[in-house]
Amino acid sequence: AMLGQGRTAGVFQLESAGITGVCVGMQPQSIEDLTAIVALYRPGPMDSIPKFIDSKLHPEKITYKTPQLQSILDVTYGCIVYQEQVIEIFRKLGGYTLGQADNMRRAISKKKQQVIVAERKAFVYGDPDRGIPGAIANGVDEQAANVIYDEILDFANYAFNKAHAVCYAKVSYDTAYLKCHYPKQYMAALMTSVQDNSMKVAGYIAACREMGLQLLLPDINHSESAFTVEPEGIRFGLAAVKNVGKGLVEQIVAERQADGPFASFRQLCERLSQTDLNKRAMENLIRCGAMDCFGHKRAQLLLVYDQAMTDAAQNRRRNLEGQIDLFSMDQTENETEIPMPDVPELPPQERMVGEKETTGLYLSGHPMDAYRPMLKNAHVASIGDIMTSFAEGADRYRDEQVVTVAGVIQSIRTRPTRNGSLMAYIVLEDDGTKTAYRLEFERGKTNGKQYS
């Protein structure tokens, strides 16, 4: 049901937009169905997918050109899909030995057209010199035998080995099973595997939200290096935060395991003063939300972290030099937190930009959230779907087709052209997918308005 509903994100071999559509159409129910999808969704056999789906959904429409084909093609609803089926056709209809039939399989897989075309006579009429009786001698009508061989010739252009397809389909099935029955664990592992690619992570985060899984912000007291599973959802991994390397994350986790979670921002600065934590990493941890657990505004922490880290480093040096007496140590321990300035919190837009710049993702929200009802009514196309359609040669989107897209402008660059007009290159991003647009317009004839 999951695959048939198009929820294929993260499923091996099945997550592209085009093959997701095939899954929705075919409604796969077994490994055999997945094997056929993997074998058919390629440039050659893709044209036969509609016939395959129609035959699967309407088995009463399936016809065989000779009864002998039913036992060979029933598993693929009357369609030739695999090289192994061709072997059986040569054996059962043409009377070939297994070795002779396998030789034809090799010729087909290597696309030896001359050999394949020359073999028609032997398949239909037989070849006594090689002990091949032929299809007619085995009770197949001459016209039907020639039509079957024509289909074999067509098949030679996209022949696929079933053993290979089954191997792919088995992994597809396993990953689909894990996603269906262990969604949090699977999606956490999946995002960890691509955490260096923010665009892929963004796509999987969108899939998590569609699945009803909550993405928990990075947390200095809970996050580990990888994405991890918690009762409330999936916790963002600290290693995905820019300028926070895995070595530093390991030091943070080791400190938590040794002495418990950090009770305050001051304590964090003190306890991590001898690690690889530098000011750039600290700033990024604050901006991505990893310090929200201390109950302070991000705007406040951004104003005090520099001095707090400097003070912590000085205290550590004095402690090593024996310059801190017992009274001052006790006083430091009794101070629960650094005094915070009375400033307003960052505006939502600035907060989301901070998350984007430090993780490559919008975490606590998306700038487009307020516009989604309007975008849905406007039938806005997904940039990711458009790019996938062109990459796979599908016809859902085509050159010169007019589509409506919406997103956040990530960058804009202008330059004059040779004819004196102005050209702009704009990088637009919707939910995690970026694309570049080139706009050209005449000087003095632009009517631009800024929207916020």
Regions found by a protein language model. Give the residues of each.
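Noncatalytic, beta-rich nucleic-acid-contacting surfaces in large DNA/RNA-processing enzymes
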Residues: 1-452
